[in-house]
């Protein structure tokens, strides 16, 4: 048995070395036939001994389907990078670095060296983190996730032949890299694929987030490594030293690494990378510039999101030319009428683009966009389609885009306000009315259960509902005439509408649909002014005293309650029995009074609504997102990304038991 194990270890070491020579160095020392013979010998020995070494090349073969992804907490954080879109922004970043270094050197005897940068390509794939233990064995691979917690993709990463399963290292490290799909692998995969892939990035991301390991293996991914994020061994003094370590460990690394001492050199390297972008066998979307000296990095430090010693230079988004066929005008809940470009379908970055946003008529005129013209379409940040301009030669046979003077839905005359057009027919314009009703009935507003957009459309079309107040005039017999409304459903909706009449004032304010006013602002208004009458009669000067209310929001609120139609509708709601209330309770001193609290996960003793009410009764502000202004994050079972964000920002985290003890 011992002899067989020794032979297995010998074969594994040999085969891994041959794989490194073949896939990473592109310089094989044995033939494919010789490799296959040794591989087959190893497979036979593994079957006989029923032992498989964790770094055996046979572990690369995907032959199973996993049940689910598990979470993995990174030992070292995977930071995002700040971005520069042009050289001016890059120079500003450089000057900030210079200033910090000059200040440090003026006060310290231990001087920092002259700034030196390392420039590399920015790969457009999926960031991965590989953990090697003290024996050099790959024990875990994970996605970046939040930067603190990712998803375990160890089995998927093992299908990447360039990633070593064992390295010659005797301390725990985490190595960061980018998993990519080459153009060659992409084309080969699509030749036989029933559903062809549209782009390289999705090909890589989809492979690593696929529970079918065979499918992952079929995509034949590659990887480049560029950072040691966690290291229990000797510290590195420079990024160059770190990159040499990565290379010496046999991890695949891009050959392009350039050292620069000033911004002129950096700019030349960026121009070079962009010039070869189309020639590469993989996608890149920019360049990465990092400070070489590790001590200088430590002095420069970090923001909440980014290291200050590194930045990504983003290339211009990909553009393509297509024809503008038409412009569609849509009406929102506020009555604003906005244009959308309808395009001749075109492939851009692996996505079929048919529509693009045109912000307003000023934007259309500024870009000289015309019907029938060839337009330049860009997917900003490779995601959102945007018209950047026109091909001048195509304008001869084009037509001017005319701003509508009537609403495309109700034919009412439009009113221009600034750069936007508005339909003021709030009562009879279907899109406005339907969206307003849906908003009014939503859970955060009047909480009318069983209400949907389809129901709102039927109420508008069949029952002639032309105002929010009309909801409270509906009769059960009328609902029975609607599609899919039987006796029980009709009665349930009538009951839900009637039950909504007794509502808290903050929900009522939110339900009114005041522009720029969300639920939090509605709560803040009520806390400040106490009554509906006070809110209606407040001034802009008083409104800006409310937390997080600036002049724009204050003017929106003020103008809203100056509208006679709106005041009339509110009066009608009150006359129909809607009774918004506000109960100001005397709150005893407690640890949560005046604190901002975020809740995440499932609690044993409270529903989400109950814990929100409980916290507010304690005088706390309940927020939906974690920020540096958050005082506590209350964590239940199966917490989400808010918990991770709290850890990242150093926000105090408490569980349900701790919460209960604090309020006893």
UniProtKB/Swiss-Prot annotation:
UniProt xrefs under PROSITE patterns: BRCT, DNA_LIGASE_N2
Needed cofactors: Mg(2+); Mn(2+)
Enzyme Commission numbers on file: 6.5.1.2
Gene Ontology CC terms, in alphabetical order: cytosol
Binding-site positions, NAD(+): 32-36, 80-81, 144, 178, 314
Domain of life: Bacteria
InterPro entries, A to Z: BRCT_dom, BRCT_dom_sf, DisA/LigA_HHH, DNA_ligase, DNA_ligase_CS, DNAligase_adenylation, DNAligase_N, Hlx-hairpin-Hlx_DNA-bd_motif
Residues annotated as catalytic: 122
A GO molecular-function descriptor: DNA binding
Matching HAMAP family: DNA_ligase_A
Family: Belongs to the NAD-dependent DNA ligase family. LigA subfamily.
This protein's name: DNA ligase
Species per Swiss-Prot/TrEMBL record: Clostridium botulinum (strain Kyoto / Type A2)
């Amino acid at each position: 048995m011992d002899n067989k194990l020794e032979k297995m270890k010998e074969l594994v070491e040999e085969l891994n070395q041959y794989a490194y020579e073949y896939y990473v160095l592109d310089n094989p020392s044995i033939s494919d036939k010789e490799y296959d013979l040794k591989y087959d010998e190893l497979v036979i020995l593994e079957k006989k001994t029923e032992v498989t070494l964790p770094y055996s090349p046979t572990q690369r073969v995907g032959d199973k389907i996993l049940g689910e992804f598990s979470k993995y907490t990174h030992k070292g954080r995977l930071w995002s990078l700040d971005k520069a879109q042009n050289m001016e922004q890059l120079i500003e970043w450089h000057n900030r670095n210079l200033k910090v270094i000059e200040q440090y050197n003026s006060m310290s005897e231990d001087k920092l060296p002259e700034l030196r940068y390392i420039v590399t390509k920015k790969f457009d794939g999926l960031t991965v983190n590989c953990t090697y233990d003290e024996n050099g064995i790959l024990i875990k691979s994970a996605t970046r996730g939040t930067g603190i917690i990712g998803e375990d993709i160890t089995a998927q990463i093992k299908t990447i032949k360039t990633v070593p399963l064992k390295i010659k290292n005797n301390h725990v490290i985490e190595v960061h890299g980018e998993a990519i799909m080459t153009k060659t692998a992409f084309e080969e995969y699509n030749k036989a694929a029933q559903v062809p892939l549209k782009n390289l990035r999705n090909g890589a991301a989809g492979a690593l987030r696929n529970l079918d390991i065979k499918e992952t293996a079929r995509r034949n991914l590659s990887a480049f490594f560029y950072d040691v994020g966690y290291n229990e061994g000797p510290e590195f003094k420079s990024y160059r030293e770190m990159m040499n370590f990565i290379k010496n460990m046999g991890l695949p690394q891009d050959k392009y690494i350039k050292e620069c001492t000033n911004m002129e050199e950096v700019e030349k390297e960026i121009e070079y990378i962009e010039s070869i972008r189309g020639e590469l066998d993989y996608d890149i979307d920019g360049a990465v510039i990092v400070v070489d000296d590790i001590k200088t990095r430590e002095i420069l430090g970090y923001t909440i999101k980014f290291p200050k010693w590194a930045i990504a230079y983003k290339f211009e988004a990909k553009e393509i030319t297509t024809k503008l066929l038409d412009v569609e005008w849509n009406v929102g809940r506020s009555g604003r009428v906005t244009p959308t470009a309808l395009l001749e379908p075109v492939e851009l970055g692996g996505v079929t683009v048919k529509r693009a946003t045109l912000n307003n008529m000023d934007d259309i005129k500024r870009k000289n966009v015309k019907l029938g013209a060839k337009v330049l379409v860009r997917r900003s940040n490779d995601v959102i389609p945007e018209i950047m301009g026109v091909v001048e030669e195509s304008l001869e046979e084009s037509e001017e885009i005319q701003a509508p003077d009537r609403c495309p839905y109700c034919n009412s005359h439009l009113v221009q306000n600034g750069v936007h057009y508005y339909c003021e027919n709030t009562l009879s314009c279907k899109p406005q009315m339907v969206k307003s009703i849906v908003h009014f009935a939503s859970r955060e507003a009047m909480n009318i259960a069983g209400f949907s957009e389809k129901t709102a459309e039927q109420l508008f079309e069949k029952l002639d509902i032309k105002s929010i107040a009309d909801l409270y005039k509906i009769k059960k017999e009328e609902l029975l005439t609607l599609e899919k409304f039987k006796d029980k459903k009709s009665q349930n909706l009538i009951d839900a509408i009637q039950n909504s009449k007794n509502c808290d004032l903050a929900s009522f304010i939110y339900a009114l649909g005041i522009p720029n006013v969300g639920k939090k602002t509605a709560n803040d208004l009520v806390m400040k002014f106490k009554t509906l009458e006070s809110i209606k009669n407040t001034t802009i000067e008083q409104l800006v005293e409310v937390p997080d209310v600036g002049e724009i929001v204050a003017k929106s609120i003020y103008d809203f309650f100056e509208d006679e139609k709106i005041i009339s509708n509110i009066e009608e709601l009150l006359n129909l029995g809607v009774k918004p209330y506000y109960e100001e309770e005397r709150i005893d001193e407690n640890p949560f009074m005046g604190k901002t609290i975020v809740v995440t996960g499932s609690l044993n003793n409270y529903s989400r609504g109950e814990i929100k009410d409980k916290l507010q009764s304690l005088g706390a502000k309940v927020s939906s997102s974690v920020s540096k202004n958050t005082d506590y994050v209350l964590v239940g079972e199966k917490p989400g990304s808010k918990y991770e964000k709290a850890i990242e920002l150093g926000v105090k985290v408490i569980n349900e038991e701790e919460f209960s003890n604090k309020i006893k």
